[in-house]
Amino acid sequence: GFSMYNPIGALEGMAAQRTAEARGGERLVNELLPASLAEAKDNGMTERDVYEATEYYKTPRGQQPGGATRMLFSHAQKTLAWDAFSFAETLMTQPVMAVIGQKVGAFGAYRDGMEIYGRAVASKDRQLVELEDWSHYDLYDKSEPVGLAMAQIVPFFKEHVG
């Protein structure tokens, strides 16, 4: 994770960085992805999620002026305790559909999709859609996997949203 398995050390580092910034020091910005596909290749960063996220967020395909591909180290303490699925077992009472690509990457989208589906036990109608031969980032904007997903999503919404 963001703490590199040393949460106390990470928090101490963040506190020291905040103190330095408060005293006029430079901000420390952590880049979460390589700057380009070329940089990723040159540095051997070819793991599926790293490469595909870079391909999406660092190219015209998905790059946006306010795109969140970096963060201030001094404000990263929130990442240490963040749990996207906190209370999912009790709060997710509405119908739930999780759509995931079966090509697994290091960032954990497949695992997270399986987890949220598994934890949404309070939902009376939960469905899992696994798209074979597609990755998490393929589902962002590639016609074929988006079409496959929408073929499941549209009827689900028509049934539950009306």
Residue ranges and their predicted role:
Residues G1-T59:
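Alpha/beta-hydrolase-fold enzymes
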Residues G1-M4, G105-G108, H136-D138:
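Flexible loop/turn segments at secondary-structure boundaries
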Residues V121-Y137:
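Catalytic histidine neighborhood in serine/cysteine hydrolases
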Residues E132-G162:
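Catalytic active-site module of serine/aspartate enzymes centered on a nucleophile-bearing elbow/loop
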